[in-house]
Curated annotation (Swiss-Prot):
Quaternary structure note: Homodimer. Heterotetramer of two MnmE and two MnmG subunits.
Keyword field: Cytoplasm, FAD, Flavoprotein, NAD, tRNA processing
Role noted for this protein: NAD-binding protein involved in the addition of a carboxymethylaminomethyl (cmnm) group at the wobble position (U34) of certain tRNAs, forming tRNA-cmnm(5)s(2)U34.
Example GO BP: tRNA methylation
Subcellular location: Cytoplasm
Descriptive protein name: tRNA uridine 5-carboxymethylaminomethyl modification enzyme MnmG
Lineage, uppermost ranks: Bacteria, Pseudomonadati, Pseudomonadota, Alphaproteobacteria, Rickettsiales
InterPro entries: FAD/NAD-bd_sf, GIDA_C_N, MnmG, MnmG-rel, MnmG-rel_CS, MnmG_C, MnmG_C_subdom, MnmG_C_subdom_sf
Length: 621
């Protein structure tokens, strides 16, 4: 009889991270996917990272995940977004060679210890006494297991829409999954529909780049992974063009033919990644919209025109493409399309990503209502970790809003749910100055080491980095000049006759690392990433101190548990509406209860008093 500790269904960005994490924890793991060669497939844009998303990638890497390492082996255009603004909103991003990314991912996973990969399609999940028992393939084979992580992406009852055409598919040229949709409905999960889309692909050899604007990447690419010393993949340029009045006229004249506006699509699309039809309708006074022409590979002439996702008929797509500067003679290789799919209300899962209804069943990725590779991967690694820890009868691994963007995302989803595709933004985090891309490993890697999900290689690299940080900090506190000497070289400080260390100088708004190196050449020998980290920590020290105080308050509420069997209707001082809301959401801690919409401070205090009265020893087990 075939039996595994953890089975992952789906080999997208959530699935590969879940599978690898489970395997790293020493659990016998099986990844079931329709096409093994499509592991980590970039279904839409050929890029990883961005504002907030880049921080998610760094956090995944901090837990020894795959995404950051793989993009460093396949990244062809690196750019730090928002670098002219504060470090809390910097967004590392890299264009990928789409085929190379898949190739590297396949090579890694097919050689992963404790991980088997099976080509197949799961039709059903066998449940016994509200507990996972096995998965059933479409050929009738039953594979027994203790835990299942469902990472179905856009495949649950998926339909592609191109104009009036409606094609059953989970991705173009790939069949959807109806069996698992039926399974979830049978088990009583709350199912709804969401929509996303992708633009047409263009033959780069037919583009007139002289009519576009060159967009260069960073001169020195900054790796995502702490395992990467430097990027050795050749780097290439992207280009920018824009829509025209003629483009907009064509779209307006044919809105009734768009699947989005004809009523054919019922699912809600992503607010922050709208189709070109949505842009023209919702921003009707805007005369043009930027389009980023992004190469899909070093040896691939396919161009991804980021900014014109559409579900218009093919012939209309071809027509509007011709109105865009540089694309007048462009050949369309594949039309754009919208895709509609099932998802589950994420309030049906716990913060471990295990479902509330079925023990041993975990959800990760678009099934939880998110959009984006990075959001999916962040959920995948947590689901994989917790499924494996549960197999080993160990405590679950919880990331909170105070420790990570992954924690913010999971808390948002499980507390508030979502009725539209959820995308991560820096604005979603109240602690974003503390949760930066540059300190992800310092926040999370030790936590990963403690539970055993971090390999020895990364552990050694992390330990060495921590030692180097301390040595560099000592050096920066040692290197100093008097205020009079600083004034002579143009550094304006209060003339109090005291020595100013480099860390003191970092607090001056106009002072930076480059100036420090110029004044103290010995700093050239130091790791620049560590210098930048200490520069940020020093410059924003007063803000960070206040934020850490807020975090301590937050964490005190996060550890104040609410018992699973609490009866809110026995707390007379809160309204029936709030009692019903709390009974539905079943918050696990006081902190989670406070974040539920409509829960008043008075209600929170009533719960705290009730818990103290009910549980005289102060516990809430």
């Amino acid at each position: 009889m075939l039996k595994y500790g953890v089975i992952i269904i789906g080999g997208g960005h959530a699935g590969v991270e879940a599978a690898a994490a489970s395997a790293r924890l020493g659990v016998h793991t099986l990844l079931i996917t329709l096409k093994p060669e499509n592991l980590g497939e970039m279904s839409c844009n050929p890029a990883i990272g961005g504002i907030a998303k880049g921080t998610l990638v760094k956090e995944i890497d901090a837990l020894d995940g795959l995404m950051g390492f793989v993009i460093d082996k396949a990244g062809i255009h690196y750019k730090m977004l928002n670098e002219t603004r504060g470090p809390a909103v910097w967004g590392p991003r890299a264009q990928a060679d789409r085929k190379l990314y898949k190739k590297v991912m396949y090579q890694i996973l097919t050689n992963y210890r404790n991980l088997d990969i099976l080509y197949g399609k799961v039709e059903d999940i066998q449940i016994k006494s509200s507990k996972v028992e096995a998965v059933i393939l479409n050929n009738g084979i039953k594979i027994f297991c203790q835990k299942v992580v469902l990472t179905t992406g856009t495949f649950l009852s998926g339909f592609i829409h191109i104009g009036s055409m409606k094609i059953p598919a989970g991705r173009i040229y790939e069949e959807p999954s109806y069996g698992l949709s039926n399974t979830l409905k049978r088990l009583g999960f709350k199912i709804a529909r969401l929509k996303t889309g992708t633009p047409p692909r263009i033959d780069g050899r037919t583009i007139d780049y002289s009519k576009t604007t060159l967009q260069q990447g960073d001169q020195i690419p900054r790796p995502f992974s702490e395992l990467t010393d430097a990027i050795d993949v050749p780097q290439i340029n992207c280009f920018i063009t824009k829509t025209t009045a003629e483009t907009h006229d064509i779209i307006r004249e044919n809105l009734d033919k768009s699947a989005m506006y004809s009523g054919q699509i019922k699912g809600i699309g992503p607010r922050y990644c709208p189709s070109i039809e949505d842009k023209i309708v919702k921003f009707s006074t805007k005369l043009e919209h930027r389009i980023f022409l992004e190469p899909e590979g070093l040896e691939d002439y396919t161009i991804y025109p980021n900014g014109i996702s559409t579900s218009l008929p093919k012939e209309i797509q071809y027509k509007l493409i011709k109105t865009i500067p540089g694309l007048e003679n462009a050949q369309v290789l594949r039309p754009g399309y919208a895709i509609e799919y099932d998802y589950v209300d994420p309030r049906e899962i716990n913060i471990t990503l295990e479902t509330k209804k079925i023990t041993g069943l975990y959800f990760a990725g678009q099934i939880n209502g998110t959009t984006g590779y990075e959001e999916a991967a962040g959920q995948g690694i947590i689901a994989g970790i917790n499924a494996a820890l549960s197999v080993k009868d160990q405590e679950p691994f919880i990331l909170t809003r105070a420790t990570s963007y992954i924690g913010v995302m999971i808390d948002d989803l499980t507390t508030s749910g979502t009725v539209e595709p959820y995308r991560m933004f820096t604005s979603r985090s109240e602690y974003r100055l503390s949760l930066r891309a540059d300190n992800a490993d310092l926040r999370l890697t030790e936590l990963g080491i403690n539970i055993g999900v971090v390999t020895e290689k990364r552990k050694n690299i992390f330990t060495k980095k921590c030692n180097n940080i301390e040595k560099t900090k000592l050096l920066l506190n040692k290197l100093s000049l008097t205020t009079s000497k600083l004034a002579k070289i143009g550094i304006q400080v209060a003339q109090d006759g005291k020595y100013k260390t480099v860390l003191d100088l970092f607090k001056i708004p106009t002072f930076n690392v480059e100036q420090a190196i110029k004044i103290f050449p010995i700093l050239r020998k130091q790791n620049n990433n560590i210098l930048q980290l200490l520069y940020i920590e020093a410059k924003y020290a007063s803000y960070l101190t206040r934020q850490y105080a807020d975090i301590n308050l937050f964490q005190s509420e996060e550890i104040q548990l609410i018992p699973k069997n609490i009866d809110y209707f026995k707390i007379p001082s809160i309204s029936l509406e709030i009692q019903e809301k709390l009974s539905y959401h079943k918050p696990t801690t006081i902190g989670v209860a406070r974040r539920i919409s409509g829960i008043t401070p008075a209600a929170i205090m009533a719960i705290i008093i009730y818990l103290k009265t009910k549980y005289s020893d102060g516990s809430s087990k």
